[in-house]
Amino acid sequence: MKKTGILNSDISRVVADMGHMDWLGIGDAGTPVPKTTEKIDLAVSAGMPSFISVLKEVLKELQVQKIYVADEIKDSNPKQLENIKRILPDVEIKFIPHTQLKKNLSEAKAFIRTGEETPFSNVILESGVIF
């Protein structure tokens, strides 16, 4: 049995397979996931697990150089945006329309669905390199 880090075998596999500039999505329970993108469904109930708790765990194992966030989060969920900025202080944030973010998920290796039920709690992580 794995002792530390991400215990979910699907997330662990996807993170280990990420190359430079690959994309991984994490988001709320209502995010539509393209049929071409692997969906890793962690949602248990409303709010469980939270978007931020899953994001924090993934960031312990994945080097990220840029994130894509829906522009609408600025007005509709500024608290969540502040949470994202706080845990990714040195990572470039690119704001794009929510419709574009949803389309871009078709290019992601996978999407992790959380139990989050707050608007625009979605992010696409672009992997970096550790050297």
Swiss-Prot record:
Q: Which domain of life is it from?
A: Bacteria
Give binding positions for substrate: 28, 98, 120-122
- Reactions catalysed according to its record: beta-D-ribopyranose = beta-D-ribofuranose
Pathways involved: Carbohydrate metabolism; D-ribose degradation; D-ribose 5-phosphate from beta-D-ribopyranose: step 1/2
From the UniProt record, which GO molecular function terms apply?
D-ribose pyranase activity; intramolecular lyase activity; monosaccharide binding
An annotated GO BP: D-ribose catabolic process
Instruction: Enumerate the UniProt keywords alphabetically.
Output: Carbohydrate metabolism, Cytoplasm, Isomerase
Q: Where in the cell is it found?
A: Cytoplasm
Q: What is the stated purpose of this protein?
A: Catalyzes the interconversion of beta-pyran and beta-furan forms of D-ribose.
Describe, as the record does, how this protein assembles with itself and its partners.
Homodecamer.
- Record family assignment: Belongs to the RbsD / FucU family. RbsD subfamily.
Q: What is this protein called?
A: D-ribose pyranase
Tell me what organism the protein belongs to. Lactobacillus acidophilus (strain ATCC 700396 / NCK56 / N2 / NCFM)
What gene name does this entry carry? Answer: rbsD
